[in-house]
From Swiss-Prot:
Gene: speE
Cellular component, GO annotation: cytosol
Binding-site list for S-methyl-5'-thioadenosine: 29, 104, 136-137, 162
Any Gene Ontology biological process: spermidine biosynthetic process
Coiled-coil regions, chain positions: none
EC number: 2.5.1.16
Protein name per the record: Polyamine aminopropyltransferase
Length: 280
């Protein structure tokens, strides 16, 4: 392997030993594809780790299954971001999903993922239920009809560059508007250690917009601090805390990280310093 490939954040480096296979700049960001000794091929955007073949389930399972196992219906799903295909792949494991809109702003992320990381997207790209749109997910949410989706998932990068607008009130209000009754919204919500201020602000804002929102904590070892979060929100009570057993039974055996038991523990694993900051 050629050397160390590092992500730098606030005076700390997070690195993998490996080789750079592709490095290019799209109209939106710098994209790198690497081959690492530890986690296989991986993707970086603007120098930040996004995903890798042997790590992606830590992230994708945590984002998808608490939402799809708890929403009242899951026929129509919107995924904003997620150009590697991993989030859509986990969603399409549910036969109840009839239509999934995958809206990714950077077409090169999709193309490079299909070429170099085909195992992450799997059969998504040929599944007739998945409609890929290369475009702005923020504009998509703003223009979508009221109550048009059962589940809305935001699989974006950190709050900078093209993903910055995925973290503000106007966007979250549109996500609430397009969610059907009984629906669930979910988003990656940064690290409570490496991005503490952003994380706390996101959870507070989602509670204001939706009425009910709670973070779930897990680990993604290649991300800053290794400790990550996903926040789930709903209008009609914290339904994301109640797993539907029949749906869970369909997917649990194929999961490496998620299970109903893991989900319960991860939702309850709020550290004291975060609980104090989130207290009314």
């Amino acid at each position: 392997m050629g050397g160390w490939i590092d992500e730098e954040h606030r005076g700390v480096r997070y690195g993998l030993a490996g080789d750079v296979l592709v490095e290019e700049t799209s109209p939106f960001q710098r994209i790198s594809v690497i081959r690492s000794e530890r986690y296989g091929k991986g993707l970086l955007l603007d120098g930040c780790w996004m995903t890798a073949e042997q790590q992606e389930r830590h992230y994708h399972e945590a984002l998808v299954h608490p939402a799809l196992c708890s929403a009242e219906a899951i026929e129509r799903v919107l995924v904003i971001g997620g150009g590697d295909g991993g989030t859509a792949r986990e969603c399409l494991r549910y036969p109840e999903v009839i239509h999934l809109d995958l809206v990714e702003i950077d077409g090169r992320v999709v193309e490079l993922s299909q070429e170099h990381l085909p195992g992450i997207g799997g059969a998504v790209w040929s599944d007739s239920r998945c409609q890929l749109t290369v475009g702005d997910g923020i504009a998509w949410a703003a223009n979508a009809p009221d109550q048009s989706y059962d589940v809305v998932l935001v699989d974006g990068s950190d709050p900078a560059g093209p993903a910055e607008g995925l973290f503000n009130r106007a966007f979250f209000e549109h996500c609430r508007r397009i969610l059907k009754p009984g629906g669930v919204f979910a988003t990656q919500s940064e690290s409570p250690e490496a991005f503490r201020e952003v994380h706390v602000a996101m959870v507070r804002l989602l509670r204001e917009v939706f009425g009910h929102a709670d973070p779930l904590y897990g680990w993604v070892p290649m991300y800053p601090s290794g400790w990550w979060s996903w926040t789930f929100a709903a209008v009609d009570g914290p339904r994301y805390r109640t797993v539907q057993p029949a749906r869970a039974a369909l997917v649990a055996e194929g999961c490496e990280i998620w299970s109903p038991r893991w989900q319960q523990g991860a939702l309850d694993a709020v550290p004291a310093f975060i609980a104090r900051e989130l207290a009314p």
